[in-house]
Amino acid sequence: MLVYLIAGEPSGDMLGARLMRALKEKNPKIKFAGVGGENMEKEGMKSLFDITDLAIMGLAEVIPSIPKVLRHIRETVDDVKEKKPDVVITIDSWSFSARVHKALRKKKIKVLQMHYVAPQVWAWKKRRAKTMYKYIDRLLTLFPNEPQYFIPHHLPTDFVGHPVVESSMINADPKEFLEKYQISPDKKIMLILPGSRHNEVANLLPVFLEMAEELKKLYPDLFFVLPTVKTVKQRVTDMVKDKQSDILVITTQAERYAAAKSAVAAVAASGTVALELAIVNVPHLVAYKVPPITAWLVRRLTHIKYVNLTNLLLDRPIVPELLQEDCNKEKLLATTKDLLNSKSELYKTEQKGFENLRKVLGVGVMRPSQKAAEIVLEAIKEYNKK
């Protein structure tokens, strides 16, 4: 059996790696091909191309990358045609994934087509849910409220759970990490998480670093740790090397988890990482900044109250969101001071909210990758009967 997986960014790479492990547990002879990052490659898949090429985001920033992306779509479709897998599973990155699925349909390549991680139609285009059945045979979602948007439109959809509940961060032991970098017990670790895309780092890291400089003056015992990924490591390293505050840049997943388990606070780009921080009770804020034209378009096209997943899932403002003009040194500094104060209302609100979030996500109860693997194998079996 050959499973063809396509993950276009680091979060999808981690999700894909967990799915691969779960599939191998159920069928040790299973083979993999496709597109992914270092985590999926560790599980035995040789990526067709470097996913760094797809690490783009933002309506205005995408245009220069269009020729490269179109070339990769053609390469992917040709590879699927040649390898003849039992299933093609795209993971997140719907913009790229949709084009691959449409091209496979157009070329009439007979293969089961699935997508893992529903596009956020409730935030963007609800009409998109009405047409997805034309391009994929089955959809796997992370949140329990999502199937209702797709099932009425002829698309078999299954809620499998969010991968954050399986995160190794939950059981990480920081001891080895602290010893390796000789971080003394009297130091308080604070995480700086500017995102995994080049444009995110360019937009967020400068203001995060400005805040860190001021924060260090107020709290000399703070020790800053900046987890990043290899796709943006050089840019991050260049940006922090001249700063007065000592900032430890780390790139491995294990060290990121260990650092988070010992952190007293964090500032983060909105995304899955913020959900992980909430799961392990790290006080944090989310901040995001994009070019003005992108921000204008997003505000016109979206219909949501929050950008942070914790706030969206609980439907109330638990985690502070500092967006666009609010993403400045002064507001970051003021909010972080509250995060570092266990007696502040913000600190108490977050801790109570995080407890409720764990219940909503089924932490300790659900195993999303196992459920996803079961559905994939069942879908292949059903498809082969046709």
Segments (PLM) and residue ranges:
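Nucleotide-activated sugar donor-binding and catalytic core shared by glycosyltransferases
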Residues: 1-386
